[in-house]
Amino acid sequence: MTSPSIESGARERTRRAILDAAMLVLADHPTAALGDIAAAAGVGRSTVHRYYPERTDLLRALARHVHDLSNAAIERADPTSGPVDAALRRVVESQLDLGPIVLFVYYEPSILADPELAAYFDIGDEAIVEVLNRASTERPEYPPGWARRVFWALMQAGYEAAKDGMPRHQIVDAIMTSLTSGIITLPRT
């Protein structure tokens, strides 16, 4: 007889293999079939269905998994310590390392339509907001939360640039320059 801890360990490894495979497959092929994900995970399609009976179940689990990875990356980047520019750079690098699956998760209609997931996504980046607030100057023309929106928009541009093959260091530098200096210099009149 198998002990419960061994069984749950094997079950967790299988679950993780399915989620990791889904991250890789769906980032490149958003409409990929569950069979493609199963093959990438090294399991049968019936195994995927045992863990995630419907595609939406897998997508919900994937969304939570990616969001949790993002939060863990934020924590590892330690954005509350050190000079603000170094803290921002560490956060940008940590988020960029998650790759294009972030675009899929945050733009997949079936995920966006889930109010529970929307609430779940709205937490976790408080440390980023804190470092952005440390770096930002009060600008009355900016609505509340603007720096956060700009940060995530630049990250989206970074994920897209990475998919297009732009070197990582150029992406990080471009995001940092955009955050700290902007991208447009108007002629002085």
UniProtKB/Swiss-Prot annotation:
Q: Enumerate the UniProt keywords alphabetically.
A: DNA-binding, Repressor, Transcription, Transcription regulation
The molecular function GO annotations come to: DNA-binding transcription factor activity; transcription cis-regulatory region binding
Record keyword RNA-binding present? no
**Keyword flag Transcription:** yes
Q: Which residues bind DNA?
A: 33-52
* Annotated stretches, region: Proflavine binding: 70-71
What is the documented disruption phenotype for this protein? Deletion of the gene increases the expression of lfrA and produces higher resistance to multiple drugs.
Activity regulation: Repressor activity is regulated by binding of different substrates of the LfrA multidrug efflux pump, such as acriflavine, proflavine, ethidium bromide and rhodamine 123. Binding of these ligands causes the dissociation of LfrR from the promoter, inducing lfrA expression.
Ranges for domain HTH tetR-type: 12-70
Induction context = Negatively autoregulated.
A Pfam family found in this protein is: TetR_N
Q: How does it assemble?
A: Homodimer. Forms a structurally asymmetric homodimer exhibiting local unfolding and a blocked drug-binding site.
Q: Which PANTHER family match?
A: HTH-TYPE TRANSCRIPTIONAL REGULATOR BETI (PTHR30055:SF234), HTH-TYPE TRANSCRIPTIONAL REGULATOR RUTR (PTHR30055)
**Notes on the domains:** Binding of ligands causes significant conformational changes.
Q: What does this protein do?
A: Represses the transcription of the lfrRA operon by binding directly to the promoter region of lfrR-lfrA. Binds specifically to a 143-bp region upstream of the lfrR gene.
Recorded protein name is HTH-type transcriptional repressor LfrR
Q: Which gene encodes it?
A: lfrR
